[in-house]
Amino acid sequence: MNAKHKTVFIAFSSQKGGVGKSTFTTLTASILHYRLGYNVVVFDADFPQHSLIKMKERDLKMVMENEALKKLAYKQFTTINKKAYEIIQHRADSVLEAANEFIGASAIPIDAVFFDLPGTVNTPGILKALAGMHHIFTPITADRVIMESTLVFTQLLQDVIMKKGETAIKTINLFWNQVDG
């Protein structure tokens, strides 16, 4: 691997479920990989749901059982000259080490690693995993409980993790989701 190549670690993270973390992880990874040509990998560390792994398995089964979908998938992957990005199931407490091992063993340089993390700081290793991210994106909704929880979560990241200085975090970005139009 090129020593100058810098892989970016990204997580969509929040203390609440149902705000869109897994959806945004999938959408962003897919756009970067399939549309913009970046090499990405996703680590699904959201125990016990592991919704991204389940989605991958469900989608693969659906494609393999349908000739029309097989042809479309073949056309897509030959057109862009890329395989599907990998989704790897792992535990939050050692996901950073697993990601670094994957990057080191990869034949192609990995541009971005996305992490689908559990929605609670009570999960073993979650604060360490968050401290290893370069960019954290936090979806918020117009629900008072979710907003308060998100602000407390963001304050925790800034006051506890970032002020200690033992972090890779460059940005924490809050954004609105599920907004009525």
What label would you give each PLM region?
Residues 5-7, 37, 108-110, 133, ...:
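A general structural motif
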